[in-house]
Amino acid sequence: MSEGEQLHLDKLFERLLKARKIFKNKEVLRHSYTPKDLPHRHEQIEALAQILVPVLKGETPSNIFVYGKTGTGKTVTVKFVTEELKKVSQKYNIPVEVIYINCEIVDTHYRVLANIVNHFKDETGIEVPLVGWPTDEVYAKLKQVIDMKERFVIIVLDEIDKLVKKSGDEVLYSLTRINTELKRAKVSVIGISNDLKFKEYLDPRVLSSLSEEEVVFPPYDANQLKDILTQRAEEAFYPGVLEEGVIPLCAALAAREHGDARKALDLLRVAGEIAEREGASKVTEKHVWRAQEKIEQDMMEEVIKTLPLQSKVLLYAIVLLDENGDLPANTGEVYSVYRELCEYLDLEPLTQRRISDLINELDMLGIINAKVVSKGRYGRTKEIRLNVTPYKIRNVFRYDYAIQPLLTVSLKGGQRRLL
Ligand SMILES: Nc1ncnc2c1ncn2[C@@H]1O[C@H](COP(=O)(O)OP(=O)(O)OP(=O)(O)O)[C@@H](O)[C@H]1O
Protein backbone atom coordinates (compact mmCIF):
# COMPACT_ATOMS: atom_id res chain seq x y z
CA MET A 1 0.00 0.00 0.00
CA SER A 2 1.39 3.43 -0.92
CA GLU A 3 1.88 6.15 1.70
CA GLY A 4 -1.07 8.25 0.60
CA GLU A 5 -3.53 5.35 0.50
CA GLN A 6 -5.90 5.03 3.43
CA LEU A 7 -5.65 1.88 5.55
CA HIS A 8 -9.05 0.23 5.91
CA LEU A 9 -8.55 -1.89 9.00
CA ASP A 10 -11.97 -3.50 8.79
CA LYS A 11 -11.18 -4.75 5.28
CA LEU A 12 -7.73 -5.91 6.39
CA PHE A 13 -9.21 -7.98 9.20
CA GLU A 14 -11.75 -9.51 6.84
CA ARG A 15 -9.07 -10.38 4.31
CA LEU A 16 -6.85 -11.95 6.99
CA LEU A 17 -9.79 -13.87 8.40
CA LYS A 18 -10.71 -15.24 4.97
CA ALA A 19 -7.15 -16.44 4.49
CA ARG A 20 -7.47 -18.49 7.68
CA LYS A 21 -8.72 -21.76 6.33
CA ILE A 22 -6.79 -24.13 8.54
CA PHE A 23 -8.46 -24.34 11.95
CA LYS A 24 -12.16 -24.98 12.37
CA ASN A 25 -11.80 -24.91 16.18
CA LYS A 26 -8.32 -24.59 17.63
CA GLU A 27 -9.56 -24.78 21.23
CA VAL A 28 -9.97 -28.53 20.76
CA LEU A 29 -6.17 -28.87 20.66
CA ARG A 30 -5.57 -26.97 23.91
CA HIS A 31 -4.51 -28.73 27.12
CA SER A 32 -7.59 -27.54 28.98
CA TYR A 33 -10.03 -29.19 26.54
CA THR A 34 -11.65 -32.42 27.73
CA PRO A 35 -12.62 -34.64 24.77
CA LYS A 36 -15.85 -36.64 24.80
CA ASP A 37 -14.03 -39.92 24.38
CA LEU A 38 -10.55 -41.04 25.42
CA PRO A 39 -9.24 -43.63 22.96
CA HIS A 40 -6.92 -46.27 24.46
CA ARG A 41 -7.84 -45.43 28.01
CA HIS A 42 -10.97 -47.56 28.30
CA GLU A 43 -9.17 -50.06 30.52
CA GLN A 44 -8.13 -47.33 32.98
CA ILE A 45 -11.60 -45.73 32.83
CA GLU A 46 -13.16 -49.06 33.71
CA ALA A 47 -10.66 -49.70 36.51
CA LEU A 48 -11.43 -46.30 38.06
CA ALA A 49 -15.17 -46.81 37.64
CA GLN A 50 -14.95 -50.23 39.36
CA ILE A 51 -13.19 -48.68 42.34
CA LEU A 52 -15.58 -45.73 42.60
CA VAL A 53 -18.90 -47.50 41.93
CA PRO A 54 -19.50 -48.35 45.65
CA VAL A 55 -20.40 -44.66 46.04
CA LEU A 56 -23.64 -45.33 44.16
CA LYS A 57 -24.57 -47.91 46.81
CA GLY A 58 -23.68 -45.54 49.63
CA GLU A 59 -20.40 -47.29 50.42
CA THR A 60 -17.01 -45.63 50.82
CA PRO A 61 -14.66 -46.33 47.92
CA SER A 62 -10.97 -47.08 48.39
CA ASN A 63 -8.31 -44.42 48.05
CA ILE A 64 -6.58 -44.60 44.67
CA PHE A 65 -3.06 -43.96 43.53
CA VAL A 66 -2.77 -43.19 39.81
CA TYR A 67 0.61 -43.12 38.12
CA GLY A 68 2.25 -43.04 34.71
CA LYS A 69 4.63 -40.89 32.73
CA THR A 70 3.83 -37.34 31.70
CA GLY A 71 1.16 -36.90 29.00
CA THR A 72 -0.32 -40.38 29.42
CA GLY A 73 -3.80 -39.03 30.13
CA LYS A 74 -3.94 -39.41 33.92
CA THR A 75 -5.49 -36.03 34.70
CA VAL A 76 -7.96 -36.01 31.83
CA THR A 77 -9.11 -39.57 32.62
CA VAL A 78 -9.56 -38.97 36.35
CA LYS A 79 -11.51 -35.77 35.68
CA PHE A 80 -13.63 -37.55 33.06
CA VAL A 81 -14.54 -40.45 35.37
CA THR A 82 -15.17 -38.36 38.51
CA GLU A 83 -17.35 -35.87 36.62
CA GLU A 84 -19.40 -38.73 35.13
CA LEU A 85 -19.76 -40.25 38.60
CA LYS A 86 -21.03 -36.93 39.88
CA LYS A 87 -23.66 -36.82 37.11
CA VAL A 88 -24.81 -40.42 37.61
CA SER A 89 -24.94 -40.01 41.39
CA GLN A 90 -27.63 -37.34 40.99
CA LYS A 91 -29.96 -40.03 39.63
CA TYR A 92 -29.44 -42.02 42.83
CA ASN A 93 -29.83 -38.98 45.05
CA ILE A 94 -26.38 -39.42 46.47
CA PRO A 95 -24.49 -36.12 46.73
CA VAL A 96 -20.93 -36.36 45.40
CA GLU A 97 -18.42 -33.50 45.54
CA VAL A 98 -15.22 -33.66 43.52
CA ILE A 99 -12.41 -31.35 44.64
CA TYR A 100 -9.53 -31.11 42.20
CA ILE A 101 -6.26 -29.71 43.56
CA ASN A 102 -3.11 -29.17 41.50
CA CYS A 103 -0.31 -29.66 44.02
CA GLU A 104 2.23 -27.99 41.78
CA ILE A 105 0.50 -24.74 42.78
CA VAL A 106 -1.12 -25.74 46.07
CA ASP A 107 1.96 -27.27 47.64
CA THR A 108 1.69 -26.97 51.41
CA HIS A 109 -0.29 -28.81 54.08
CA TYR A 110 -2.05 -25.59 55.05
CA ARG A 111 -3.02 -24.58 51.53
CA VAL A 112 -4.40 -28.00 50.64
CA LEU A 113 -6.65 -27.93 53.70
CA ALA A 114 -7.66 -24.29 53.05
CA ASN A 115 -8.55 -25.12 49.44
CA ILE A 116 -10.81 -27.93 50.57
CA VAL A 117 -12.62 -25.75 53.11
CA ASN A 118 -13.01 -22.97 50.54
CA HIS A 119 -14.45 -25.36 47.97
CA PHE A 120 -17.63 -25.33 50.09
CA LYS A 121 -17.70 -21.57 50.70
CA ASP A 122 -20.90 -20.92 48.74
CA GLU A 123 -22.67 -23.50 50.85
CA THR A 124 -21.10 -22.68 54.23
CA GLY A 125 -20.14 -19.03 53.97
CA ILE A 126 -16.78 -20.01 55.51
CA GLU A 127 -13.60 -18.89 53.79
CA VAL A 128 -10.14 -19.58 55.18
CA PRO A 129 -7.39 -17.10 54.23
CA LEU A 130 -4.53 -18.66 52.27
CA VAL A 131 -2.15 -17.95 55.16
CA GLY A 132 -2.42 -17.06 58.79
CA TRP A 133 -4.62 -19.51 60.69
CA PRO A 134 -3.14 -22.28 62.84
CA THR A 135 -3.16 -25.45 60.71
CA ASP A 136 -5.06 -27.40 63.39
CA GLU A 137 -7.83 -24.87 63.20
CA VAL A 138 -8.10 -25.20 59.40
CA TYR A 139 -8.26 -28.97 59.77
CA ALA A 140 -11.03 -28.68 62.38
CA LYS A 141 -12.95 -26.36 60.00
CA LEU A 142 -12.45 -28.83 57.18
CA LYS A 143 -14.03 -31.64 59.18
CA GLN A 144 -16.90 -29.37 60.15
CA VAL A 145 -17.74 -28.23 56.59
CA ILE A 146 -17.35 -31.64 54.99
CA ASP A 147 -19.47 -33.29 57.67
CA MET A 148 -22.36 -30.84 57.37
CA LYS A 149 -24.35 -33.44 55.47
CA GLU A 150 -24.27 -37.00 54.23
CA ARG A 151 -22.18 -36.99 51.08
CA PHE A 152 -19.13 -38.38 49.34
CA VAL A 153 -16.18 -36.11 48.88
CA ILE A 154 -13.55 -37.16 46.37
CA ILE A 155 -10.32 -35.22 46.75
CA VAL A 156 -8.07 -35.40 43.68
CA LEU A 157 -4.47 -34.45 44.46
CA ASP A 158 -2.75 -34.05 41.08
CA GLU A 159 1.07 -33.96 41.02
CA ILE A 160 0.97 -35.25 44.58
CA ASP A 161 4.76 -35.85 44.47
CA LYS A 162 5.34 -32.06 44.42
CA LEU A 163 3.34 -31.67 47.62
CA VAL A 164 5.15 -34.49 49.40
CA LYS A 165 8.60 -33.30 48.34
CA LYS A 166 7.90 -29.74 49.41
CA SER A 167 5.91 -30.28 52.59
CA GLY A 168 6.04 -33.94 53.62
CA ASP A 169 3.17 -36.39 53.92
CA GLU A 170 1.39 -35.08 57.01
CA VAL A 171 -1.62 -33.84 55.06
CA LEU A 172 -1.99 -37.23 53.35
CA TYR A 173 -1.83 -38.89 56.74
CA SER A 174 -4.76 -36.77 57.94
CA LEU A 175 -6.87 -37.02 54.79
CA THR A 176 -6.55 -40.77 54.33
CA ARG A 177 -7.70 -41.31 57.92
CA ILE A 178 -10.32 -38.64 58.19
CA ASN A 179 -13.31 -41.00 57.82
CA THR A 180 -12.87 -42.26 61.39
CA GLU A 181 -13.48 -38.69 62.58
CA LEU A 182 -16.57 -37.97 60.46
CA LYS A 183 -20.19 -38.84 61.26
CA ARG A 184 -22.08 -38.12 58.05
CA ALA A 185 -19.71 -37.58 55.13
CA LYS A 186 -17.17 -39.97 53.58
CA VAL A 187 -13.93 -38.94 51.97
CA SER A 188 -11.74 -40.70 49.48
CA VAL A 189 -8.47 -39.49 47.99
CA ILE A 190 -7.15 -39.94 44.46
CA GLY A 191 -3.43 -39.15 44.24
CA ILE A 192 -1.88 -38.66 40.78
CA SER A 193 1.83 -38.68 40.04
CA ASN A 194 4.31 -39.11 37.20
CA ASP A 195 7.17 -39.67 39.62
CA LEU A 196 7.24 -42.99 41.39
CA LYS A 197 10.32 -42.17 43.43
CA PHE A 198 8.30 -39.97 45.73
CA LYS A 199 6.85 -43.11 47.31
CA GLU A 200 10.17 -43.44 49.12
CA TYR A 201 9.37 -40.20 50.96
CA LEU A 202 6.10 -41.59 52.32
CA ASP A 203 5.55 -43.05 55.75
CA PRO A 204 4.65 -46.74 55.11
CA ARG A 205 1.27 -46.22 56.78
CA VAL A 206 0.45 -43.34 54.45
CA LEU A 207 1.64 -45.35 51.46
CA SER A 208 -0.55 -48.31 52.26
CA SER A 209 -3.67 -46.21 52.81
CA LEU A 210 -3.11 -44.07 49.71
CA SER A 211 -2.37 -47.07 47.51
CA GLU A 212 -5.36 -49.20 48.54
CA GLU A 213 -5.91 -49.36 44.79
CA GLU A 214 -3.45 -48.45 42.06
CA VAL A 215 -4.16 -47.64 38.43
CA VAL A 216 -1.24 -47.56 36.02
CA PHE A 217 -1.16 -45.46 32.83
CA PRO A 218 1.34 -46.91 30.35
CA PRO A 219 2.87 -44.65 27.67
CA TYR A 220 1.06 -44.49 24.33
CA ASP A 221 2.72 -46.03 21.28
CA ALA A 222 2.79 -44.28 17.90
CA ASN A 223 -0.38 -46.01 16.66
CA GLN A 224 -2.35 -45.06 19.74
CA LEU A 225 -1.18 -41.46 19.46
CA LYS A 226 -2.30 -41.52 15.83
CA ASP A 227 -5.82 -42.47 16.91
CA ILE A 228 -5.90 -39.76 19.58
CA LEU A 229 -4.73 -37.11 17.10
CA THR A 230 -7.10 -38.26 14.36
CA GLN A 231 -10.06 -37.94 16.70
CA ARG A 232 -9.06 -34.43 17.78
CA ALA A 233 -8.08 -33.33 14.28
CA GLU A 234 -11.58 -34.03 12.96
CA GLU A 235 -12.96 -31.32 15.21
CA ALA A 236 -9.96 -28.99 15.10
CA PHE A 237 -9.22 -28.67 11.35
CA TYR A 238 -11.26 -28.08 8.21
CA PRO A 239 -11.61 -31.24 6.08
CA GLY A 240 -8.69 -32.03 3.78
CA VAL A 241 -6.35 -29.48 5.39
CA LEU A 242 -3.90 -32.00 6.87
CA GLU A 243 -1.57 -33.71 4.42
CA GLU A 244 -1.52 -37.48 4.82
CA GLY A 245 1.85 -37.73 6.60
CA VAL A 246 1.17 -35.03 9.20
CA ILE A 247 -0.59 -37.04 11.92
CA PRO A 248 1.74 -40.07 11.63
CA LEU A 249 4.76 -37.78 11.91
CA CYS A 250 3.42 -35.94 15.00
CA ALA A 251 2.60 -39.34 16.54
CA ALA A 252 6.03 -40.79 15.74
CA LEU A 253 7.91 -37.79 17.15
CA ALA A 254 5.87 -37.84 20.37
CA ALA A 255 6.16 -41.63 20.72
CA ARG A 256 9.91 -41.25 20.64
CA GLU A 257 9.58 -39.07 23.73
CA HIS A 258 7.94 -41.60 26.06
CA GLY A 259 4.53 -41.59 24.32
CA ASP A 260 3.38 -38.17 25.46
CA ALA A 261 -0.06 -37.19 24.11
CA ARG A 262 0.45 -33.59 25.20
CA LYS A 263 3.56 -33.34 23.04
CA ALA A 264 1.72 -34.91 20.08
CA LEU A 265 -1.15 -32.41 20.39
CA ASP A 266 1.27 -29.50 20.74
CA LEU A 267 3.10 -30.53 17.57
CA LEU A 268 -0.15 -30.70 15.62
CA ARG A 269 -1.40 -27.35 16.92
CA VAL A 270 1.88 -25.49 16.36
CA ALA A 271 2.28 -27.01 12.86
CA GLY A 272 -1.23 -25.71 12.06
CA GLU A 273 -0.38 -22.28 13.45
CA ILE A 274 2.79 -22.05 11.35
CA ALA A 275 0.89 -23.06 8.21
CA GLU A 276 -1.86 -20.55 8.97
CA ARG A 277 0.56 -17.71 9.57
CA GLU A 278 2.27 -18.23 6.27
CA GLY A 279 -1.08 -18.34 4.48
CA ALA A 280 -0.69 -21.98 3.36
CA SER A 281 -3.80 -23.91 2.38
CA LYS A 282 -2.50 -27.20 3.81
CA VAL A 283 -0.48 -28.37 6.81
CA THR A 284 2.50 -30.41 5.60
CA GLU A 285 5.23 -32.53 7.21
CA LYS A 286 7.59 -29.56 6.79
CA HIS A 287 5.33 -27.57 9.11
CA VAL A 288 5.57 -30.38 11.67
CA TRP A 289 9.38 -30.32 11.59
CA ARG A 290 9.31 -26.57 12.05
CA ALA A 291 6.85 -26.97 14.90
CA GLN A 292 9.23 -29.45 16.57
CA GLU A 293 12.04 -26.92 16.28
CA LYS A 294 9.89 -24.09 17.65
CA ILE A 295 8.69 -26.13 20.63
CA GLU A 296 12.27 -27.10 21.45
CA GLN A 297 13.42 -23.48 21.18
CA ASP A 298 10.55 -22.26 23.37
CA MET A 299 11.44 -24.89 25.96
CA MET A 300 15.06 -23.80 25.84
CA GLU A 301 14.02 -20.20 26.46
CA GLU A 302 12.06 -21.33 29.51
CA VAL A 303 15.10 -23.21 30.81
CA ILE A 304 17.35 -20.16 30.33
CA LYS A 305 14.81 -17.92 32.07
CA THR A 306 14.86 -20.07 35.19
CA LEU A 307 18.64 -20.52 35.51
CA PRO A 308 20.22 -19.22 38.74
CA LEU A 309 21.91 -15.81 38.38
CA GLN A 310 25.48 -17.19 38.44
CA SER A 311 24.69 -19.52 35.54
CA LYS A 312 23.12 -16.64 33.62
CA VAL A 313 26.27 -14.54 34.06
CA LEU A 314 28.37 -17.50 32.97
CA LEU A 315 26.16 -18.02 29.91
CA TYR A 316 26.42 -14.35 29.07
CA ALA A 317 30.23 -14.61 29.19
CA ILE A 318 29.97 -17.36 26.56
CA VAL A 319 27.62 -15.19 24.47
CA LEU A 320 30.17 -12.34 24.51
CA LEU A 321 32.97 -14.69 23.47
CA ASP A 322 30.78 -15.98 20.64
CA GLU A 323 30.00 -12.46 19.42
CA ASN A 324 33.70 -11.65 19.57
CA GLY A 325 34.49 -14.64 17.34
CA ASP A 326 36.30 -16.41 20.21
CA LEU A 327 34.44 -19.73 20.37
CA PRO A 328 35.28 -22.50 20.95
CA ALA A 329 36.84 -21.33 24.20
CA ASN A 330 38.19 -23.31 27.13
CA THR A 331 37.07 -23.12 30.76
CA GLY A 332 39.86 -20.69 31.71
CA GLU A 333 38.95 -18.25 28.93
CA VAL A 334 35.27 -18.36 29.84
CA TYR A 335 36.15 -17.95 33.50
CA SER A 336 38.15 -14.78 32.98
CA VAL A 337 35.28 -13.06 31.13
CA TYR A 338 32.83 -14.35 33.73
CA ARG A 339 34.94 -12.77 36.52
CA GLU A 340 34.91 -9.41 34.78
CA LEU A 341 31.15 -9.58 34.41
CA CYS A 342 30.81 -10.36 38.12
CA GLU A 343 32.90 -7.33 38.93
CA TYR A 344 30.72 -5.22 36.67
CA LEU A 345 27.61 -6.45 38.50
CA ASP A 346 29.21 -6.27 41.96
CA LEU A 347 28.62 -9.98 42.33
CA GLU A 348 30.90 -12.32 44.31
CA PRO A 349 32.49 -14.64 41.67
CA LEU A 350 32.44 -18.41 42.17
CA THR A 351 35.68 -20.43 41.99
CA GLN A 352 36.87 -21.78 38.64
CA ARG A 353 36.13 -25.27 39.88
CA ARG A 354 32.51 -24.41 40.63
CA ILE A 355 32.20 -22.66 37.25
CA SER A 356 33.47 -25.83 35.62
CA ASP A 357 30.53 -27.67 37.27
CA LEU A 358 28.09 -25.03 36.05
CA ILE A 359 29.51 -25.41 32.52
CA ASN A 360 28.71 -29.12 32.73
CA GLU A 361 25.18 -28.28 33.87
CA LEU A 362 24.63 -25.91 30.92
CA ASP A 363 25.95 -28.68 28.67
CA MET A 364 23.53 -31.20 30.15
CA LEU A 365 20.64 -28.78 29.61
CA GLY A 366 21.66 -28.56 25.94
CA ILE A 367 22.25 -24.78 26.06
CA ILE A 368 25.95 -25.12 25.33
CA ASN A 369 28.20 -27.86 24.05
CA ALA A 370 31.26 -28.57 26.20
CA LYS A 371 33.33 -31.24 24.50
CA VAL A 372 36.42 -32.61 26.28
CA VAL A 373 39.36 -32.71 23.87
CA SER A 374 42.87 -34.01 24.37
CA LYS A 375 45.71 -31.51 23.89
CA GLY A 376 48.46 -34.14 23.84
CA ARG A 377 51.10 -33.40 26.44
CA TYR A 378 49.14 -30.33 27.65
CA GLY A 379 46.45 -32.65 29.00
CA ARG A 380 42.71 -32.39 28.40
CA THR A 381 40.60 -29.30 28.04
CA LYS A 382 37.02 -28.39 27.24
CA GLU A 383 35.92 -26.82 23.98
CA ILE A 384 32.88 -24.71 24.72
CA ARG A 385 30.37 -23.68 22.07
CA LEU A 386 26.86 -22.20 22.14
CA ASN A 387 23.86 -24.30 21.09
CA VAL A 388 21.40 -21.40 21.09
CA THR A 389 21.87 -18.22 19.08
CA PRO A 390 23.23 -15.21 21.04
CA TYR A 391 20.22 -13.29 19.72
CA LYS A 392 17.79 -15.68 21.47
CA ILE A 393 19.70 -15.50 24.74
CA ARG A 394 19.85 -11.70 24.64
CA ASN A 395 16.11 -11.66 24.02
CA VAL A 396 15.47 -13.71 27.15
CA PHE A 397 17.85 -11.56 29.23
CA ARG A 398 16.24 -8.35 28.04
CA TYR A 399 13.39 -8.94 30.49
CA ASP A 400 15.63 -10.03 33.36
CA TYR A 401 16.38 -7.17 35.75
CA ALA A 402 19.35 -8.86 37.40
CA ILE A 403 21.25 -9.44 34.17
CA GLN A 404 19.98 -6.46 32.12
CA PRO A 405 22.91 -4.12 33.06
CA LEU A 406 25.27 -6.48 31.22
CA LEU A 407 23.50 -6.22 27.90
CA THR A 408 25.36 -3.10 26.84
CA VAL A 409 28.90 -4.40 27.48
CA SER A 410 30.96 -6.12 24.82
CA LEU A 411 34.49 -7.51 24.53
CA LYS A 412 37.49 -5.55 23.32
CA GLY A 413 38.92 -7.46 20.34
CA GLY A 414 41.65 -9.99 21.06
CA GLN A 415 42.13 -8.86 24.64
CA ARG A 416 38.78 -10.12 25.80
CA ARG A 417 38.41 -7.21 28.19
CA LEU A 418 35.09 -5.53 28.71
CA LEU A 419 34.36 -2.36 26.81
N1 LIG B 1 -6.59 -41.04 25.38
C1 LIG B 1 -6.64 -39.73 25.11
N2 LIG B 1 -7.52 -39.25 24.23
C2 LIG B 1 -7.57 -37.93 23.95
N3 LIG B 1 -6.77 -37.02 24.50
C3 LIG B 1 -5.86 -37.45 25.40
C4 LIG B 1 -5.74 -38.81 25.75
N4 LIG B 1 -4.75 -38.94 26.65
C5 LIG B 1 -4.25 -37.72 26.85
N5 LIG B 1 -4.92 -36.81 26.11
C6 LIG B 1 -4.65 -35.38 26.05
O1 LIG B 1 -3.24 -35.19 26.23
C7 LIG B 1 -2.97 -34.09 27.09
C8 LIG B 1 -2.20 -34.58 28.30
O2 LIG B 1 -3.03 -35.40 29.12
P1 LIG B 1 -3.05 -35.32 30.72
O3 LIG B 1 -2.90 -33.89 31.17
O4 LIG B 1 -4.21 -36.05 31.21
O5 LIG B 1 -1.69 -36.10 31.02
P2 LIG B 1 -1.06 -36.50 32.42
O6 LIG B 1 -0.77 -37.96 32.35
O7 LIG B 1 -1.91 -36.02 33.54
O8 LIG B 1 0.31 -35.70 32.34
P3 LIG B 1 1.20 -35.03 33.52
O9 LIG B 1 1.73 -36.16 34.36
O10 LIG B 1 2.29 -34.33 32.77
O11 LIG B 1 0.29 -34.10 34.26
C9 LIG B 1 -4.31 -33.48 27.42
O12 LIG B 1 -4.56 -32.42 26.54
C10 LIG B 1 -5.30 -34.62 27.19
O13 LIG B 1 -6.56 -34.11 26.81
Curated annotation (Swiss-Prot):
Q: Which UniProt keywords apply?
A: ATP-binding, DNA replication, DNA-binding, Nucleotide-binding
Reply yes or no: does the keyword DNA-binding apply.
yes
For this entry, the protein name equals ORC1-type DNA replication protein
Enumerate the SUPFAM superfamilies for this protein. Answer: P-loop containing nucleoside triphosphate hydrolases (SSF52540), Winged helix' DNA-binding domain (SSF46785)
HAMAP family for the chain: ORC1_type_DNA_replic_protein (MF_01407)
Record GO biological process: DNA replication
GO MF annotations in UniProt? ATP binding; ATP hydrolysis activity; DNA binding
Which family would the database say this protein is a member of? Belongs to the CDC6/cdc18 family.
